[in-house]
Every structure is written in structure tokens, then in C-alpha cells.
Amino acid sequence: QRQMCIRDSYILPLSHDEVVHGKKSLIGRMPGEYADKFSQTRLLLMYQMAHPGKKLTFMGTELAQFIEWNFRQSLDWLLLDYPTHEAMQQFVRELNHFYTRTPVLYQLDDSWDGFEWISVDDRAHSVLAFLRKDAEGNKILCLFNFTPVEHYPYRVRLPFMATLDQAISNVDLREIKDVETVQLEDGYYADIMLSPYEAVYYYVNETEPGQQLQ
């Protein structure tokens, strides 16, 4: 997938073809209880937004519309009368705004310099972590918990000493969970609390090894 996004100016589509002809809507395909469906949809959207490649998401996803798209009728705007659906729309709005004002997430989409895996093979926890980077050296750490299980602490090994300032999470936009790395004998680590089905981005502020963190 990374080869395609670098070589072919890759697009990451969640298009109309995915929500018609008996496939169900995006949120309708999510397993679990009612609340879990919303959490997993937000998780998917944050995973899509963090990946290299340009994004395409079909209308209705931001409303968490349960019925399939039907060209004979309008979207179910009445869903916005319900708090969970209104919150989904607000989340998608904030995620889109965050993307447009954060060059780290798109400036080097067509370069190997814009992406670095941090955790790619943690099958035991089903957690992925990677860095996105821009040309000025700014970095964002992106983590994704694809399970209904809380992980705390979830230990991430980083290639540098840093403080991690939470940028956005799909769990609660008001809950801030900043993190500091620690230096152990074999490298630098951050212990992060991951809620069930959480996706979270952190601004990375690198510090010198051994420097006292404030």
C-alpha cells in the first residue's frame, strides 16, 4: 500500500461503492454494541486520515447514517437531532479541520520521508503506531487500538527522547493525555493509555537525551 501511495499518488477512498448494493453503510458494518459502532467508525476515519495518500469519504458517513445510500432520497439529516449522530458530525468536522491545518499529515505524502513505522507487528494487542513527518522535521505520533480492550500502560518504543502533546483523539476531544518519554538501557519509551477502539495523534516535541523534562 505504501508503494502505491508513493508511486501512484494514491487515493484512500471510502466511496459510494462501499455503501450500496447490500453492503450496508459504513457504521452499519461495524460489529459490537451500538456505542462500539460509533467508536470504530471514528477509529477508521482517523486511521484513514493519518495514512499517506489523499482522502475520499462519501457523504453520509459524517452523520453515521445506518441505511445505505439511496440516490432517490436525501441524506437522513434528521439524525442530527440525536446526540450520538450530532457528535459524530462534530468529530468529522474537527478531524477535517485538523488535517487541513496540519501539513505533517499531507506534505510528504509522495515521499518515503513522510512516514515511519513505530509498531507494526503487535498482534497480541492489535495496536498500530507510526510517525508522520513534514519537510521541517515536525512529527506526529499516531496510535490505533483496534480492540475493545483498554491498554494501560501501552509501551511504545521511540527513536528519540520527547514529550508527546495530545492533538486529537476519537474517544473524547476534551480529555487531554500528554505523555513524557523515559530513557531505559535499550532506548526511549512512552507509556500511553489507550482506551477501547481509541485512535490518538500526539505532537512530538523532541528533547536531547538526558535532558530534564519539564
Predicted segments, located by residue:
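Conserved oxyanion/phosphate-binding beta-strand-loop segments in alpha/beta enzyme cores
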Residues: 13
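Carbohydrate-interacting/catalytic domains
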Residues: 8, 17, 22-26, 32-38, ...
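Short, small-residue-biased leader/transition segments that mark boundaries at the very start
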Residues: 2-6
